[in-house]
């Protein structure tokens, strides 16, 4: 396989993705590029747009990731706009708006988009959980401190390394790795 670039301006996201893909025999190079994102509630639409922009910049096989929180009680928002809400509200404001002093059911969704010049492929992963009433153990992955996956008493940020094993991102990356093996993009 030619070099696969992961286009993101987030070094923590790159590190996590590289760690998850390594056991699959997939090595990714970091392309530290901030892509202008379209504003949409649709995570798939944002990921598809980002990967096409990334491919036009790199002219090589590229992958991007976009994730968000889907809250059915709020009409599927913030969805693809989670980062916009997060930037405007911060951790406390996010909890105040979306949990309103009670935990609110949520789905964390990640979409990996891949483009190799011939086509765009999307790979999805999701995790059910809830938005907690107060941020816990704020770390580098913004809303990880407010999302508590089902079957756990801790938020993603409190789970530390366990998060990498159960996250929506891992699920999407596992699908992506299987695709690359099946399509003979890598040798296993």
Would you name each region that the model predicts?
Residues 2-5, 12-188:
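Anionic-ligand binding patches
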């Amino acid at each position: 396989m030619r070099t696969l670039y992961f286009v993101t301006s987030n070094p923590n996201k790159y590190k996590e993705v590289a760690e998850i893909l390594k056991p699959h025999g997939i090595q990714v190079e970091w392309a530290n590029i901030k892509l202008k994102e379209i504003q949409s509630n649709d995570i798939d639409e944002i990921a598809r747009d980002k990967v096409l922009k990334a491919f036009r910049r790199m002219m090589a096989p590229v992958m991007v990731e976009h994730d968000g929180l889907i809250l059915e009680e709020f009409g599927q928002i913030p969805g693809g706009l989670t980062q916009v809400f997060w930037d405007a509200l911060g951790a406390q404001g996010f909890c105040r708006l979306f949990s309103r002093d009670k935990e609110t059911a949520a789905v964390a969704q990640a979409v990996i988009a891949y483009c190799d010049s011939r086509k765009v492929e999307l790979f999805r992963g999701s995790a059910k959980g809830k938005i907690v009433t107060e941020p816990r153990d704020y770390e580098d992955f913004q809303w990880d401190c407010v999302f508590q996956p089902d079957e756990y008493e801790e938020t993603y940020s409190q789970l530390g390394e366990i998060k990498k094993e159960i996250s929506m991102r891992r699920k999407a990356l596992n699908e992506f790795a299987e695709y690359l093996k099946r399509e003979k993009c890598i040798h296993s």
